[in-house]
């Protein structure tokens, strides 16, 4: 059966989802961490085997026959619930009680004087003396106290609590009659009070010390062996985008049994449009099917047949499984359209409207995978052209790289094309129906059916982009989430936590899921929550839209899932779509990722009445989950995983594993990552140096020390409050390991000698046992559990019993009806009145009428400090304001539309058209008038701190020239220096926008100054990396081609700068695909055409989200002067490395350009990037005023050109072959996956073997591979890595080092890295020229001669 028929017939879905369902159904708890409920006491041993768990079927048989009583004990137990039921085998009474100390069960109670707990019955009221039910309550209470008082440890129990309290509590207990017994029992199952919970994955910290002077080579070797015995080293942590995740089809199109003919019959126009729709959709579908069937599937078969197990992972990185997902849904739509085409346009609309919602999730995942697709494909093609692309057994369709790219990337164009056709089809139907009805209303329901399904399809397509907001819609910009660059990320929910307004530079989105809250907080019973798993936090959003709850069960077709919409917005950096189905949300609670322990259990869903998976989140901090209302603070949260679109793909264990992986991502110090080989329990071992672990802020509750003894466990636990269990492992001989272990509660000790091959098995057994002890012995975690149990019991007894769901549903229907009535009179807009509130101190709001005036006043205040010319500026402000107000509205609207379209096209990329100088005498007023074309909306000149300047380019030129003119007869050297700064900035911008000629030598001076300044800014912006190096070994290894110096300034050739400063194109992304905004920070600051921020200081809290450079204090000229002064006077440790020109000849350089691939110098549409061979606009022939022409950079270059030629070697030909390779390996192909989902790799061996990589290197590069590279770079902190504002210094990369087949300790590694930073020979030849250049730029030399 072909790929198309398997997808279209549904045979594939049936097989896939049935297999997934069976695997979950037969998945048992054996081999996992099992946690029993608290059993009414704190035990010193493993209580798992003491808990007699009944199956869900047994409980379902008991609930209808049981009686539930509730009571409250002030002195000890608090809220108490007791379930009394008859034993079906013996006829005696059984009880199961619930309190904050857990669950206790007593079978076949003795209810007479033979019981030693009979004194409690003597304290019953006379009316209850003969009641066996009341006797069972009293005896159960006293037995609970007896278990609790006998708990070992430092647990204090009120000794005065006796049979009198037990009898009194039984007298006051009331029968729960508000809810049916079976419904109340189901709530107990939903809360997980009667079941054993499971954990399938956990995190273990592994600590070693290779850097100490006392560490011998033998210890280093043993550490190396031990860590590999723990598990397999991971090449990649995780990436959900690289996992096949089809969406189950809840609704599908079926051919009508009794088809009704459409009213418009045999219409040529409508039939033509339907034919076009089928043709377009068929073309997209068959191209995808051809790619899968004739290339990708044979390639996967070929790779799976090989011995290497990592090959399929590498193939999926190049050809992600999302290709299969979009092919599957296209085949389903194509088959539905073929069936519907025989019944006319109404059925065509039904087919499209029914299937189109399933395009959304597949396409947003596919769009996220396309960020680096072209780069990965080009690299894969260059390495495997002969083996794969020219192999007819694999490439059966003879597909080239351009063909594959057009099919995979071009698939995203399908949706907008389909929308255009659907709009034409609908308009044509309306037009023809109007003619047929003779302009009268049509009484049939045909048009309403068309409208319904048309809106369903178009809403999905529109959700991929966004519509421009109406000018009348006012949304406060403070009510949004900001990225570190100040760009609005998205509107999520109200009551946004302040701590999540920062840190977006390193934060990644790991997963988003829609779940049902078992314990809603308020009387409105909003029980749908959105779980967002970040790399550092977990966040719960509550849907608070009554109409959403009212409509969710009344839909005959699929609506877009809220979690999918949020994922598209956060992962693909898209604003939230303006959809009617998008509900209002508010923040429920949140916590740090390592403060939560998550377990999963089985229960019965009250919605589907089927067995479903549930999750329990327990916060182990002292304060519980954080929220905006202290009264609603909770310790635990229970959720049902909805049986919806992700069925077959997402279960509780997968979500728990994502949370544990996020804990790994949250590590602040370098580490090595290993995972156990047991499929039942995944133990992620994070190996860190002792010094790094001591400074680590995110620690696991369990720690394993390698060859490091712990002499005083009590003192150790006092110093490490987050650690609850510690192990030590050391070799006795080559085959035996000595294991020693302790826990904080002093209830566990281990001192055994095991075989080295049994290390993983021993670790698993010890971890499973200690997790059970952790939850059942008296500890800080069990204290938090008692508080969680107390809330659960109170919720069942006092909140759940008071909820009237019938009245609640009636109220919701009334609200939805009122909203629908209001929507007729006015269009529906999202309520953002309470969306994220940002403190006013961080905002400077400017009203529309004063936008230009405020902007100029801000510039005037800075000028006033230097020249005291405020009076002149104020008079000019009045003229500008008047001219702005006199501008006609019509022209304003037209220009606004032009700028809006440009902004939408460029999306933040500055227009690279060469600027034209404008003299103030003639054009100032006109330009200032044009600044009023910004529209009627508010303009904000600062978002938090630092304060960015929101100016048009024309305004910026005017302000610069006005300042120069006003300074006039300034104060001597200060005036000259200010003019030089303004002209230098203008000249640098013009240079960056001009096209660079072939003659690189003529611009060497300018290039070096730009690179020097860029390096200063880069070192200022880079403080470390959070990336896990995926291909490291143990212990750390450093390649000879890399160095580490935090203060190193790197100068590269002009070609490298061209690659480095190029903005991230849409088609070939050379930036980190993870967080577009985060990874662009250093690069944007390097781009001289990018406007600098005006800032005096950073955030008030001391942690800036991004680093900004002030125009006043950090201009290009000042940065150059400062850097060159430091280097010239040898007052810093910075090193300037110049590339050696002896490695390549001029002919070779020409050959390099001629042999470059088509994508090497690819320039996206509407983007001007410097290219080789272009004729630039002459810098010295531009019309400028005499006052600014005197310090032009081109004239400076002419004066000391000969000096630069002699000292900087103008005949120097850069080693482009080597440098381009470095750029490609470290920049372009360094990151393959999305940072929001995964820890990415940075390796040339990402998709290919080391042999293939070595064979692809030039001969010269292979011969000099061991020599020191003049490019001093750090693999763990490249421009594409994430920048963490918490880092104060650059850390050593977690990469292995092999030096003469001997593993070096970290101390020796650090020495080698420092020694590798020795200055090159070329530095001595450039010292004099730099001093000369510094004096020129400081104005100490006179050019008048």
UniProtKB/Swiss-Prot annotation:
Compositional bias ranges of the Basic and acidic residues kind: 854-867, 874-892
Entry keyword set: Cell cycle
Function text: Co-assembles with BUD4 at bud sites. BUD4 and BUD3 may cooperate to recognize a spatial landmark (the neck filaments) during mitosis and they subsequently become a landmark for establishing the axial budding pattern in G1.
Sample GO molecular function, one term: guanyl-nucleotide exchange factor activity
Record has Cell cycle as a keyword: yes
Protein name: Bud site selection protein 3
Domain of life: Eukaryota
Family the entry assigns: Belongs to the BUD3 family.
Ranges of Polar residues composition bias in the record: 910-935
Residue ranges of the region described as Disordered: 843-939, 951-998
Gene: BUD3
Species the sequence originates in: Debaryomyces hansenii (strain ATCC 36239 / CBS 767 / BCRC 21394 / JCM 1990 / NBRC 0083 / IGC 2968)
Pfam family, one: PH_BUD3_C
Biased segments, Low complexity type: 961-980
Biased amino acid composition, Basic residues: 893-903
């Amino acid at each position: 059966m072909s790929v198309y028929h398997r997808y279209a017939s549904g045979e594939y879905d049936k097989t896939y989802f049935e297999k997934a369902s069976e695997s979950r159904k037969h998945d048992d708890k054996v081999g996992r961490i099992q946690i029993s409920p608290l059993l009414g006491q704190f035990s010193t041993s493993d209580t798992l085997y003491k808990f007699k768990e009944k199956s869900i079927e047994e409980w379902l048989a008991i609930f209808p026959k049981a009686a539930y009583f509730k009571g409250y004990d002030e002195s000890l137990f608090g809220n108490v619930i007791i379930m009394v039921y008859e034993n079906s085998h013996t006829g005696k009474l059984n009880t199961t009680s619930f309190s904050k100390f857990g669950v206790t069960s007593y079978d076949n109670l003795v209810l007479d004087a033979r019981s030693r707990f009979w004194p409690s019955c003597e304290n019953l009221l006379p009316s209850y003396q003969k009641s066996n039910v009341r006797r069972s309550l009293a005896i159960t209470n006293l037995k609970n106290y007896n278990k609790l008082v006998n708990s070992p440890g430092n647990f204090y129990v009120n000794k005065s609590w006796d049979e009198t309290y037990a009898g009194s509590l039984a007298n006051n207990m009331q029968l729960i009659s508000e809810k049916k017994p079976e419904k109340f029992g189901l709530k107990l199952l939903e809360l997980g009070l009667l079941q054993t919970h499971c954990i399938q994955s956990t995190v273990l910290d592994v600590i070693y010390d290779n850097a100490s002077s006392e560490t011998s080579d033998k210890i280093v070797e043993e550490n190396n062996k031990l860590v590999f015995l723990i598990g397999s080293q991971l090449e990649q942590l995780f990436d959900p985008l690289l996992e096949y995740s089809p969406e189950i089809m809840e609704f599908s199109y079926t051919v009508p049994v009794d088809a009704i003919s459409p009213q418009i019959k045999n219409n040529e126009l409508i039939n033509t449009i339907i034919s076009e729709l089928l043709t377009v959709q068929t073309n997209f579908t068959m191209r995808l099917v051809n790619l899968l069937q004739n290339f990708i599937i044979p390639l996967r078969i070929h790779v799976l047949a090989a011995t290497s197990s990592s090959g399929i992972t590498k193939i999926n990185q190049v050809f992600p499984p999302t290709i299969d997902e979009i092919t599957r849904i296209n085949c389903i739509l194509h088959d539905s359209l073929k069936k519907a085409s025989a019944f006319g346009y109404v059925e065509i609309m039904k087919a499209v409207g029914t299937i189109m919602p399933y395009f959304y999730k597949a396409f947003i995942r596919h769009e996220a995978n396309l960020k680096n697709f072209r780069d990965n494909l080009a690299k894969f093609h260059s390495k495997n052209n002969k083996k794969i692309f020219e192999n007819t057994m694999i490439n059966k369709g003879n597909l080239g790289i351009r063909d594959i790219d057009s099919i995979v990337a071009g698939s995203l164009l399908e949706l907008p094309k389909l929308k255009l056709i659907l709009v034409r089809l609908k308009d044509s139907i309306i037009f023809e129906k109007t003619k047929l009805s003779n302009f009268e209303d049509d009484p049939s329901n045909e048009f309403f059916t068309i409208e319904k399904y048309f809106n369903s399809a178009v809403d999905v397509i529109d959700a991929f982009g966004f519509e421009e907001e109406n000018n009348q819609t006012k949304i406060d910009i403070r009510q949004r989430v900001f990225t570190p660059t100040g760009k609005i990320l998205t509107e999520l929910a109200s009551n946004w936590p302040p701590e999540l307004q920062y840190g977006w530079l390193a934060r990644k989105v790991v997963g988003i899921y829609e779940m049902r809250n078992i314990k809603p907080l308020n009387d409105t019973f909003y029980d749908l929550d959105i779980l967002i798993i970040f790399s550092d936090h977990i966040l719960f959003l509550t849907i608070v839209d009554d109409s959403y709850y009212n409509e969710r069960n009344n839909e005959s077709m699929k609506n877009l899932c809220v979690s999918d919409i949020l994922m598209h917005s956060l992962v693909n950096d898209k604003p939230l779509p303006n959809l009617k189905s998008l509900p209002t949300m508010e923040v429920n609670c949140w916590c740090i990722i390592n403060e939560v322990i998550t377990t999963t259990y089985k229960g019965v869903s009250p919605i589907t009445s089927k067995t479903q998976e549930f999750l329990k989140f327990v916060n182990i901090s002292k304060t519980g989950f954080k929220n905006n209302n202290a009264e609603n603070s909770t310790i635990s949260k229970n959720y049902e995983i909805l049986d919806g679109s992700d069925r077959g793909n997402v279960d509780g264990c997968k979500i728990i594993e994502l949370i544990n992986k996020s804990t790994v991502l949250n590590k602040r110090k370098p580490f090595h990552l290993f995972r156990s080989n047991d499929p039942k329990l995944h133990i992620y071992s994070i190996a860190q140096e002792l010094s790094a672990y001591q400074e680590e802020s995110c620690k696991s509750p369990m720690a394993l020390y390698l060859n490091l003894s712990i002499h005083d466990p009590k003192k150790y636990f006092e110093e490490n409050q987050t650690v609850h269990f510690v192990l030590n492992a050391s070799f006795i001989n080559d085959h035996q390991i000595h294991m020693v272990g302790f826990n904080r509660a002093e209830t566990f000790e281990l001192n055994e000698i095991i075989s080295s091959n049994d290390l993983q098995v021993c670790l698993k057994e010890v971890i499973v046992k200690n997790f059970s002890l952790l939850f059942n012995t008296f500890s800080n975690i069990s204290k938090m559990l008692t508080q969680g149990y107390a809330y659960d019991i109170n919720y069942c007894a006092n909140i759940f019993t008071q909820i009237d769901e019938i009245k609640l549903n009636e109220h919701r229907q009334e609200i939805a009806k009122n909203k629908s009535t209001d929507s007729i009179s006015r269009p529906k807009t999202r309520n953002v009145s309470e969306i994220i509130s940002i403190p006013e101190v961080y905002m400077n709001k400017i009203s529309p009428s004063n936008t230009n005036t405020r902007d100029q006043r801000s510039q005037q205040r800075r000028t006033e400090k230097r020249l005291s010319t405020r009076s002149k500026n104020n008079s000019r402000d009045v003229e500008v304001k008047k001219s702005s107000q006199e501008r006609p509205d019509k022209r304003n609207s037209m220009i606004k539309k032009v700028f809006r379209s440009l902004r939408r096209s460029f999306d933040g990329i500055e227009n690279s058209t060469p600027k034209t100088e404008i003299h103030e005498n003639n054009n100032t007023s006109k330009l200032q008038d044009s600044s009023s074309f910004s529209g009627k909306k508010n303009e904000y000149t600062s978002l938090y701190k630092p304060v960015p300047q929101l100016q048009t380019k024309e305004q910026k030129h005017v302000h610069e020239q006005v300042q120069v003119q006003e300074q006039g007869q300034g104060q001597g050297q200060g005036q000259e220096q200010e003019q030089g700064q303004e002209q230098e900035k203008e000249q640098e911008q013009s240079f960056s926008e001009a096209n660079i000629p072939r003659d690189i030598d003529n611009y060497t001076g300018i290039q070096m100054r730009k690179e020097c300044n860029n390096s200063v800014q880069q070192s200022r912006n880079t403080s470390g990396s959070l990336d896990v190096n995926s291909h490291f070994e143990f212990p750390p290894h450093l390649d000879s081609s890399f160095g580490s110096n935090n203060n190193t300034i790197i100068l590269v050739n002009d070609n490298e700068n061209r690659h480095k400063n190029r903005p991230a194109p849409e088609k070939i992304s050379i930036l980190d695909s993870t967080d577009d905004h985060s990874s662009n920070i250093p690069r944007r600051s390097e781009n001289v055409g990018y406007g600098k921020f005006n800032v005096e200081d950073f955030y008030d809290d001391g942690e800036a989200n991004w680093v900004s450079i002030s125009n006043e204090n950090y201009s290009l000229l000042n940065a150059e002067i400062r850097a060159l002064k430091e280097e010239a006077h040898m007052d810093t440790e910075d090193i300037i490395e110049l590339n050696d020109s002896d490695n390549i000849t001029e002919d070779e350089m020409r050959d390099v350009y001629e042999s470059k691939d088509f994508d090497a110098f690819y320039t996206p549409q509407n983007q001007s990037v410097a290219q080789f061979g272009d004729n630039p606009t002459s810098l010295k022939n531009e019309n400028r005023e005499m006052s600014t022409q005197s310090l032009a950079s081109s004239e400076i270059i002419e004066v000391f050109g000969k000096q630069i030629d002699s000292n900087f070697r103008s005949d120097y030909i850069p080693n482009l072959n080597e440098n381009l390779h470095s750029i490609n390996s470290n920049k372009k192909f360094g990151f393959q996956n999305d940072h929001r989902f995964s820890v990415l790799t940075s390796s040339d061996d990402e998709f290919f073997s080391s042999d293939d990589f070595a064979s692809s290197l030039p001969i010269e590069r292979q011969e000099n591979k061991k020599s020191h590279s003049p490019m001093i770079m750090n693999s763990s902190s490249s421009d594409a890595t994430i920048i963490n504002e918490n880092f104060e210094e650059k850390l050593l990369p977690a990469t292995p080092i092999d030096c003469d087949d001997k593993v070096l300790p970290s101390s020796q590694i650090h020495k080698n890295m420092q020694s590798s930073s020795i200055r090159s020979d070329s530095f001595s030849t450039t010292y004099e020229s730099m001093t000369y250049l510094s004096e020129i730029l400081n104005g100490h030399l006179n050019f008048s001669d």
